[in-house]
């Protein structure tokens, strides 16, 4: 076996991962080598990348243009039995159990697929704090998948590579599928499976890059909270004085837009931990949505799409130009790039001190929630567990009505412990740091229009500069929220949502409807004492 590597690290023995007769190992290749490898003329199908006019390579991930949660399984054994938040008949989630026997079959499939091949091995870190990071090894036969991993995880130095030992191994066998899935009781021939005793993830059948990124996020979500370290689906930034803010929010709530602020340096845009030293990024890159991307609206992301960035599922015209408006393949078009493609970032390491502001973003299409309210510690836990947002969905009659989404901890798909554990650890960290929490509605109000980005930015500025603390407040019934009555640079007529309705009774009836949905959703957390104690912090109906 020859080893070709960008580093001078020792020859790798892949037999310990069950791989045999490997022809060649390309370890931690340079971006130049990856560019050559992923655009080779002899590549076919989903392996081949095309060069765009912006310099970035674009790839097609096939039928999988997003994660496949129905194909996610975790081995149920002595390691995971007690702590894992397993799916159940009463509360469904994505943590479905499989046996060691099924795992053994799937591992044989993937190792057979990768054995005897020329392989790319990318070693990196998940977590910017050396004390708590996971050392990740990803093994794949596909060059662009190695490129994705190099972009998204933290890139080690030559010295670190020389002594690198993986804590977790990801074997990506995207080209193989599982012929025995039906008799094994699985969802399909494709699979994304985890074994926490072996500390290994196996991927088969899906080419979507995000399975590797979010797979490791799910693992950080398992290991860190058990050490009392918060693991968070959020963006984070830092002010000139070192003050740190974190922004939680589901897709479409403004998490990336609002944390990308010319006045503040970006720590990271998606996954963070919070330990005794402060807030730290898990990643070494960003994975941004590109649908309808324009240079004018989002210059930072647009300018990050250059050589070494990797585009997924965008429409590339024959002249190499990109049609970012075309969602015919998927609305989930993406780009991964190393974080240093963004100019205003925290350097040299993506971490900051303790957060003093925690912001929950909800886009409320019901038009009920106030644009901003300050939360008590109990309300913080309640709204964190609720993870609410709502979209306007068209019905067959052409009427648009709101569709609520409740996603625990603003990231239910990636949770591996019971949601109350994340709430408990977050609030513990907040209380130790004296941090305040705010619920910010970036959605709609009684005017039928979305709250303007200018008003929302004014609200965020007032939270971050502390001026919201000096504002007079009033109480909003049903949701039991305290809201400011005036803020600098914000239209005062929107701060009490009732004032945006011609008839205040209309707000009340909508508020009762939404409150009932909150209450029904929260029922599932009342299966333990921690959850029961929080019911009083949520909306109340007489």
Swiss-Prot record:
The keyword Metal-binding applies. ATP binds at residues 214, 233, 249-257, 298, 334, 450-451, 456. Binds 1 Mn(2+) ion per subunit. Substrate binds at residues 67, 208, 214, 334. GO terms for molecular function: ATP binding; metal ion binding; phosphoenolpyruvate carboxykinase (ATP) activity. Its main location: cytoplasm. It is found in: Cytoplasm. Pathway: Carbohydrate biosynthesis; gluconeogenesis. Belongs to the phosphoenolpyruvate carboxykinase (ATP) family. NCBIfam families: pckA, PRK09344.1-1, PRK09344.1-2, PRK09344.1-3. This is Phosphoenolpyruvate carboxykinase (ATP). The lineage of its organism: Bacteria, Pseudomonadati, Pseudomonadota, Gammaproteobacteria, Vibrionales.
């Amino acid at each position: 076996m020859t080893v070709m590597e960008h580093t001078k690290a020792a020859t790798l023995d892949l037999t310990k991962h069950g791989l045999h007769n490997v022809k060649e190992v390309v370890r931690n290749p340079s971006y130049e080598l990856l560019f050559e490898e992923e655009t080779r003329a002899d590549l076919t199908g989903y392996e081949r990348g095309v060069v765009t006019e912006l310099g970035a390579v674009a790839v097609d991930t096939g039928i999988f243009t997003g994660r496949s949660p129905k194909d996610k399984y975790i081995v149920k054994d002595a390691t995971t039995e007690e702590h894992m938040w397993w799916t159940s008949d009463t509360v469904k989630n994505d943590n479905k159990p499989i046996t060691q026997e099924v795992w053994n079959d799937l591992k044989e499939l993937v190792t057979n697929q990768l054995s005897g091949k020329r392989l790319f091995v990318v070693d990196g870190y998940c977590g910017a704090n050396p004390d708590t990071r996971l050392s990740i090894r990803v093994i794949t036969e596909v060059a662009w998948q190695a490129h994705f991993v190099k972009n998204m995880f933290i890139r080690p130095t030559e010295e670190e590579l020389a002594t690198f030992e993986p804590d977790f191994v990801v074997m990506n066998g995207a080209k193989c599928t599982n012929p025995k899935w039906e008799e094994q009781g699985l969802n399909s021939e494709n699979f994304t499976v985890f074994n926490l005793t072996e500390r290994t993830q196996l991927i088969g059948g899906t080419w979507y890059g995000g399975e590797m990124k979010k797979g490791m996020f799910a693992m950080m979500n398992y290991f860190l909270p058990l050490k009392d370290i918060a693991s968070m689906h959020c963006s984070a930034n830092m002010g000139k004085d070192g003050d740190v803010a974190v922004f939680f929010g589901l897709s479409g709530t403004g998490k990336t837009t609002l944390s990308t602020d010319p006045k503040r340096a970006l720590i990271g845009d998606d996954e963070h931990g919070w330990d005794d030293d402060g807030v730290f990024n898990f990643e070494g890159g960003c994975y941004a949505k590109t649908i309808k991307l324009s240079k004018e609206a989002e210059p930072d992301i647009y300018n990050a799409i250059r050589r070494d960035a990797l585009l997924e599922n965008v429409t590339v015209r024959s002249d190499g130009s990109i049609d970012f408006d075309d969602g015919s393949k998927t609305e989930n078009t993406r780009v991964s790039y190393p974080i240093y493609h963004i100019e205003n970032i925290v350097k040299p390491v993506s971490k900051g001190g303790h957060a003093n502001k925690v912001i929950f973003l909800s886009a409320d299409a019901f038009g009920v929630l106030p644009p901003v309210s300050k939360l008590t510690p109990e309300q913080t836990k309640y709204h964190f567990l609720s993870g609410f947002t709502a979209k306007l969905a068209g019905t067959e009659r052409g009427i648009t009505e709101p569709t609520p989404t409740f996603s625990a901890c603003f990231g239910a798909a990636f949770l591996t412990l019971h949601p109350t554990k994340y709430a408990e650890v977050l609030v513990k960290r907040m209380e130790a740091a004296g941090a305040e929490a705010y619920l910010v509605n970036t959605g709609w109000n009684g005017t039928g229009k979305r709250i303007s980005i200018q008003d929302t930015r004014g609200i965020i500025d007032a939270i971050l500069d502390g001026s919201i603390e000096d504002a007079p407040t009033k109480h909003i019934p049903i949701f039991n929220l305290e809201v400011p009555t005036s803020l600098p640079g914000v239209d005062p007529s929107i701060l009490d949502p009732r004032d945006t309705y011609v008839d205040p009774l209309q707000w009340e009836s909508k508020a009762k409807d939404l409150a009932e949905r909150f209450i029904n959703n929260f029922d599932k957390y009342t299966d333990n004492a921690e959850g029961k104690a929080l019911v009083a912090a949520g909306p109340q109906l007489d």
